[in-house]
């Protein structure tokens, strides 16, 4: 059970990391689009 919990925490952390990275990329692409306009 402890191992399962660790795996769940790891997956949640991974998801949060991917989400934050995606948001940063989105912000960056929006900024570059605004600059090119």
UniProtKB/Swiss-Prot annotation:
GO cellular component: host cell mitochondrion
InterPro entries found in the cross-reference section: Rotavirus_NSP6 (IPR006950)
Location(s) in or outside the cell: Host cytoplasm; Host mitochondrion
Protein's name in the database: Non-structural protein 6
Protein family per UniProt: Belongs to the rotavirus A NSP6 family.
Ranges annotated as spanning the membrane: none
Keywords from the UniProt entry: Host cytoplasm, Host mitochondrion
Subunit structure: Interacts with NSP2 and NSP5.
């Amino acid at each position: 059970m402890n191992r399962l919990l660790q795996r769940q925490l790891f997956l949640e952390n991974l998801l949060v990391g991917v989400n934050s990275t995606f948001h940063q990329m989105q912000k960056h692409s929006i900024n570059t689009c605004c600059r090119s306009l």
